[in-house]
């Protein structure tokens, strides 16, 4: 699909360049049935307000060509402020592995959620539709009436629900 309405337009451009560059570097796609190949997933995140992009390349094993691939994308897309190699060498269909290799100065992007600055790492849960999440969190805050109460945000990912109530709790 050349155009996906569920993602920012720039993701299609980055993906096309990712495929072109990886093909030129002879990086092969991972085959789940044979457990052969390098590239498992391309995972992109974009801050709704900041415009910052995180590039996460999920691989079966780290090879030098992955850094070259990342460097070329970083050169072409200044919006990419975070580039991470995630190594998943297990025979599983789970997307992310345990090992992360950070190729930039940070492993996260910054954005704003409900007037709070948040840092979003590749493994952190974060709502993909920021305006809808802000409306949902506002309704949850109205319902919870956190005025003067202690708010526990358990199993929270990036912590945005608790942060959205912090000013009134």
Model-derived segments and spans:
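Accessory RNA-recognition modules of RNA-modification enzymes
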Residues: 1-169
């Amino acid at each position: 699909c050349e155009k996906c309405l569920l993602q920012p337009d720039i993701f299609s451009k980055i993906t096309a360049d990712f495929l072109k560059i990886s093909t030129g570097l002879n990086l092969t796609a991972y085959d789940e049935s044979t457990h052969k190949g390098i590239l498992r997933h391309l995972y992109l995140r974009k801050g709704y307000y900041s415009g910052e992009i995180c590039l996460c390349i999920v691989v079966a094993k780290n090879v030098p060509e992955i850094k070259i691939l990342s460097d070329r994308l970083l050169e072409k897309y200044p919006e990419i402020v975070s580039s991470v190699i995630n190594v998943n060498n297990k025979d599983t269909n789970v997307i992310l592995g345990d090992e992360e290799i950070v190729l930039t100065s940070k492993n996260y992007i910054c954005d704003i959620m409900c007037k709070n600055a948040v840092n979003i790492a590749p493994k952190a849960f974060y709502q993909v539709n920021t305006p809808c999440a802000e409306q949902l969190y506002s309704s949850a805050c109205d319902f919870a009436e956190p005025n003067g109460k202690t708010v526990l945000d358990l199993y929270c990912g990036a912590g945005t629900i608790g942060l959205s109530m912090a000013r009134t709790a």
